[in-house]
Structures are given as structure tokens and as C-alpha cells.
Amino acid sequence: MYQQNSETGSLGRVVKGSWSDEEDDLLRKCIQKYGEGNWKRVPERAGLNRCRKSCRWRWLNYLKPSIKRGHFNEDEVKFIIQQHKLLGNRWSLIAAKLPGRTINDVKNYCNTHLYKKHSIENIPAPATNTMTHNTSSCVDRPESSATIKEPKWWENILVELQREEKEGKSQNCSGLDFEQDNLGQQDPNINDGMDQWLNSLKEVPNLSYQWEENLLDFDVVNLWA
């Protein structure tokens, strides 16, 4: 069993979706008889299973005889832009100040024309300009980094390291020169020692032939023993 709906004031559930021609005729007859306003009682009076909001929206945007169709003229466009800056997206207030224009028409025009025009006018710069700017900024970076001043204590350490490096190089060079000079000179004591060693070899007595022969015989006897 259906219960009475608080929105429509009639039995049954609320119908949603597109309106039929029969429903449009019922709504027209109701408005012609009772006039606009008091939308809470319109569904009951018209015999519609529609909510009051749906009835009001259908009448103001589609069925009202004074609705003006077609493109907006230049004055209307200027007025919409001016009011939109003041009121924002309050479409019902803007449409109320434009005779014959509906809330949907004003809203759709702003969403399709004004926003599209605004996006076209705010196109970002071409990629080539951005690349050129980035390239120039990259070139300038080494110059800016070169101007960075180091702390005083760090400068002192660098100076000390450079000084020690120079002193080390000078000492290495002097040592190399000394070794090269020594390589070009011969120590006379070396020659004297060599001569003494050779003379000592000459003084060693030679083994007699007889002793060598006896030594060989001794080895043979021991080998076959």
C-alpha cells in the first residue's frame, strides 16, 4: 500500500528522470490556474508524482512562455561578465536580472564560452622560450657560484697546503739533482777494494797434480767399497 509522499502530497513514489508531454501539460495548466509560487503544493494540485523542486525547475527553464531562446547579445554578455565578477556562480541571481533568460542558459554560457575564452587567453609561453630561459640560467650559474666567498679559516688552510706543496716539490728536485751528480762520479775507494780482492785470489796456492789424483782415487775406492 502506498503512503502519501511529503514532497508531492499524493500517493505513490516520486518519479525521476525526463518529463513526458503529458506531465508538461499538467504543469502548464496548474501554473495557469494557480500562478507561480507555493511550489510545495504544485505537485498535488497538478496531480504529478514529482517533487516540488523538479516542478519548479521544469517550469522556469523549459515551460515558461517568456523564456527567450537563442544567442546572447553583446549587452547581455557584458552584463553576465559584470555580475559574475560580483556574485560568482550564483546563477539564479544573475538570471533573475536578465528578462527571459533562464538559470541554465546563463550557467551554460559561462561554462562554455567565458571559461573557454579565458583559457585561450592564458595559454602558456611556447616551449622554445622556456628552453632559452633555462639555457641562459644554466650559463649564468657557474659565474654566480664562482663569486661565493670562502670562510677565512678555510682560506688559511688552503694557503698552508699550497706552501707545503711548493716546499715538497723543491726538496724533491734538489734530491734528484744530488743523485744525478753522484751517478756521474765514481768513488775511488771502490776501485781500490776491487784490486785488493783480485790480488788475494792470485795468492791462493794451486793444488798439486798428485794431490788431485789421490783425491780422485779415494773417492773411487769409497764408492765401490
Curated annotation (Swiss-Prot):
One of its GO terms (cellular component) is nucleus. It is found in: Nucleus. The keyword tRNA processing does not apply. Residues 11-67, 68-118 form the HTH myb-type domain. GO terms for molecular function: DNA binding. Transmembrane segments: none annotated. Keywords: Activator, DNA-binding, Nucleus, Repeat, Transcription, Transcription regulation. The keyword ATP-binding does not apply. Induction: This dominant Y allele is highly expressed, resulting in an inner red flesh of the beet. Activates DODA1 and CYP76AD1 in the betalain red pigment pathway. No interactions with bHLH. Betalain and anthocyanin MYBs are not interchangeable and BvMYB1 cannot regulate the anthocyanin pathway in Arabidopsis. This is Transcription factor MYB1. It comes from Beta vulgaris (Sugar beet). The gene is MYB1.
